């Protein structure tokens, strides 16, 4: 028997399948709500002026193409930290944040999931109901059992915050809680600052591990306000948490996979070991 003869065809990706169906549709009034990309009136993905300018500068520099360090481009990692935590963040100045470049937000989540599995082999991961479908797959592939916490209320078309808080309070210490920092995918229902305060209190009281996913910073209320969840957690005194974020959509560089994973530790020594 051939090595690969027993391989079964995997199910088609539902989102990419929709894109294929869209391309095959001959109607002129069709609208593509499948793949999450921004297109102009001609159906093309525009290249942002800032991206064009940055690309022009980089090409003119004729930069070398040597191997990067394992955490990627240092200047990029530093820029990510400042955007996430603020230019004057005490976490950064204390050396408590380590950031690594990642292959998009998905790559950042994958790195974070595999890393946590080494530290917390018996932990449970809790994701919102509903959540981005790949969240479950990424953590299950890493070996975690994944369960849902209450989030969206279909009847009111809004957040069921009481249910969410109750479910978080039931989790065992050491459980990992995946939280959408802003622009919740797929519902768009976000926590208010007061609600974030209560969620963080539940995380602290329950000894839970906060893992934030932020793929859409700036798409709701602006860069600063959309990033408030990260800073609220930092200011609350939680000594260790993780942030996976992506700029693939922010820069309309979907195929470039612009992501990062940031880990906050209790002190510089612990963070350096990470």
Across the structure, where does each feature detected by a protein language model lie?
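Walker B catalytic acidic pair
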Residues: 214
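Conserved core of the PLP fold type I
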Residues: 57-207, 217-219, 227-234
């Amino acid at each position: 028997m051939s090595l690969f003869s027993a391989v079964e065809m995997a199910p088609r990706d539902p989102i990419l399948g929709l894109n294929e169906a869209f391309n095959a549709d001959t109607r002129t009034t069709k609208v593509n709500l499948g793949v999450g990309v921004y297109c102009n009136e001609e159906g093309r993905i525009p290249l942002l002026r800032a991206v064009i300018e940055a690309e022009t500068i980089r090409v003119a520099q004729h930069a070398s193409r040597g191997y990067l360090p394992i955490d990627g481009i240092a200047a990029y990692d530093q820029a990510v930290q400042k955007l996430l935590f603020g230019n004057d963040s005490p976490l950064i100045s204390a050396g408590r944040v380590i950031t690594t470049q990642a292959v998009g937000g998905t790559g950042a989540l994958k790195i974070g999931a595999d890393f946590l599995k080494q530290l917390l082999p018996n932990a449970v991961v809790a994701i919102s109901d509903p959540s981005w479908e790949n969240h479950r797959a990424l953590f299950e592939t890493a070996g975690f059992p994944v369960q849902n916490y209450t989030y969206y209320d279909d009847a009111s078309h809004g957040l069921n915050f009481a249910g969410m808080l109750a479910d978080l309070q039931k989790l065992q210490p050491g459980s990992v809680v995946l939280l959408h920092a802003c622009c919740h995918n797929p519902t768009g229902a976000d926590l208010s600052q007061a609600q974030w305060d209560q969620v963080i209190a539940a995380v602290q009281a329950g000894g839970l591990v906060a893992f934030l996913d932020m793929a859409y910073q700036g798409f709701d209320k602006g860069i600063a306000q959309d990033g408030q969840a990260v800073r609220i957690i930092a200011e609350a005194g939680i000594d260790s948490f993780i942030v996976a974020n992506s700029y693939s959509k922010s820069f309309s560089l979907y195929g470039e996979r612009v992501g990062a994973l940031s880990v906050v530790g209790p002190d510089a020594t612990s963070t350096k070991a990470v």
